[in-house]
Amino acid sequence: MSQEFLDFELPIAELEAKIEALRSVSQQDQQINLDDEITRLQKKSAELTQKTFANLDAWQVSQMARHPNRPYTLDYIEHIFTDFQTLAGDRAFADDQAIVGGLARLEERPVMIIGHQKGRSIKEKVKRNFGMPAPEGYRKALRLMQMAERFKLPIITFIDTPGAYPGVGAEERGQSEAIARNLREMSMLKVPIICTVIGEGGSGGALAIGVGDKINMLQYSTYSVISPEGCASILWKSAEKASTAAEVMGLTASRLHELKLIDSIIEEPLGGAHRNYDTMSNNLKKRLLADLADLDKLDQETLLDRRYKRLMSYGYC
């Protein structure tokens, strides 16, 4: 996968381009030794990357959460779990491709996985509806959760959506009802639920699979009631104020952790999760295993009581 850089990474991109150019020259003419210069530029690039990512603002984090090369749910399933078996359809209308789910093993332990799925190519983006589920997606998710409860399997969800699909058809089929039902039912499921925001956590579309016993966020993910552009359009009548909106919305993992709305921040590799899928997957896997170990210590009554109190505390300081 070719590396893509965001606007604020352009100085890094320029250094990386120089490195690639020198490598190309070195490969074409074996008598030219450019190793020292390449090493010097690599060191400079690493230092600049470290400096850049040490001070990201909320808008830059928002851009990172949407990075086109960022790992999606199916990427984490491939890197973390084994024996994944896809389960499809809501048994009522259709199989929404914006939500994926199924049975898998985490270190030999059977679990149920559910997550939003975006696409990379134009064709796949359309197929996945840009990660925006319709009601049938949330009903599929609920069906899988209820199946997990019957078989006493922990539920692991991965959140990455700009929001629930706002189309006319989705509204006609009961989008708000599907989201509300998931909130209610998830609060009462008698098995452990671990939710992790891996990219965008957009409004009710995220919360519909985000009611859990442990709520985690990747370092450069976001979680908010509306996008920065949407907020700016409402408050300042201009999407150009998105960077200002991002700062005041408190949508970053660090801010939400301060507010005690999430439990853990999962560190990303230098430069973001897309720079190293293996490292990111290992960090996420460690967090999931630790969370499962913690939740295994709780009896069912305590588990449900804690989860319900967490849900009811949202919006209160």
Swiss-Prot record:
EC number(s) from the headed UniProt entry: 2.1.3.15
Domain CoA carboxyltransferase C-terminal: 33-294
Protein origin, superkingdom: Bacteria
One of the Pfam families matching this protein, by short name: ACCA
Listed GO MF terms: acetyl-CoA carboxylase activity; ATP binding; carboxyl- or carbamoyltransferase activity
GO BP of this protein: fatty acid biosynthetic process; malonyl-CoA biosynthetic process
Keyword match Thylakoid: no
GO cellular component terms attached to this protein's record: acetyl-CoA carboxylase complex
Reactions catalysed: N(6)-carboxybiotinyl-L-lysyl-[protein] + acetyl-CoA = N(6)-biotinyl-L-lysyl-[protein] + malonyl-CoA
Pathway: Lipid metabolism; malonyl-CoA biosynthesis; malonyl-CoA from acetyl-CoA: step 1/1
Subcellular location field: Cytoplasm
InterPro entries: Acetyl_CoA_COase_a_su (IPR001095), ClpP/crotonase-like_dom_sf (IPR029045), COA_CT_C (IPR011763)
UniProtKB keywords: ATP-binding, Cytoplasm, Fatty acid biosynthesis, Fatty acid metabolism, Lipid biosynthesis, Lipid metabolism, Nucleotide-binding, Transferase
Assembly: Acetyl-CoA carboxylase is a heterohexamer composed of biotin carboxyl carrier protein (AccB), biotin carboxylase (AccC) and two subunits each of ACCase subunit alpha (AccA) and ACCase subunit beta (AccD).
Protein role: Component of the acetyl coenzyme A carboxylase (ACC) complex. First, biotin carboxylase catalyzes the carboxylation of biotin on its carrier protein (BCCP) and then the CO(2) group is transferred by the carboxyltransferase to acetyl-CoA to form malonyl-CoA.
UniProt similarity note: Belongs to the AccA family.
Name of protein: Acetyl-coenzyme A carboxylase carboxyl transferase subunit alpha
The organism of origin for this protein: Histophilus somni (strain 129Pt)
Taxon lineage: Bacteria, Pseudomonadati, Pseudomonadota, Gammaproteobacteria, Pasteurellales
